[in-house]
Amino acid sequence: DSTPQEGSLRLYRAGVSLFMTPSVWRGNAMKTPAGDPYVKVSAINKGDVAVGVTPFVLDATASNRFCLVGIANTDRTETVPEDFRTYDEFVVWIHQNPGVCVRNLNVIGTTKTNYEQLDGLKNPEDKPRHAAFYLTATNVPVGTTIGMQCEPAKLEASVVTSSETETLSAAVPAVPPHFDGFVRVWAVLPPSEPSWPDDARLDLDYGVEMAPSMQSHQWGIHPREVLCAADASLFNSAFRLVMVGSCGTIFKSA
């Protein structure tokens, strides 16, 4: 089909969160210089990358929300769902809507040798959920200490890196029902390093256990593939870990 494809793109600002349910970003629509809440996009052929000409305005003084959610549609209708009642509903929505994208990333410049960030964490469900967290450090000096902590979820883990790329994983028996809080991510450079290397990176990924009866089970991985034996034993062997969200930080020279 060579008929030009047209549509619209809406962009929303959000705080850092491992569960990007719509209430985190619904009321923070970005606008163009003309005040429109969407931009027109077009592609020459069906399936091509659509390109918009008009920019959105990102005002750093108006909000401290720098994570973004984008939704592309074939018309100008705003299609933001209500908050999801389960993790499963959220994951299915993401997988079934290729026009949805999330950018949960901070870019910072700092002269401090220690770093700390609070990443939002929610459990929308009426029951506690088994989950796993993965903190990956990339391009960091050997000897950097990285860690993650969330007391209500009984998450407490840290490691001293032995290579420039290292992943710290930990499973928790229960993220409490309707929990609405934070995971503390932290890192400390070794004494020999005066500053963070350019493009050093910390990424926190969050996976939740899904039963075979849940639709998102098909996109999961077996806990044994990513966790040590002791942590993997917390999970039912028929269940799968399904990625729900991630948050990242990139260090840049100030």
Give residue spans per PLM region.
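Extracellular/luminal regions of secreted and cell-surface proteins that mediate adhesion/ECM remodeling
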Residues: D1-A254
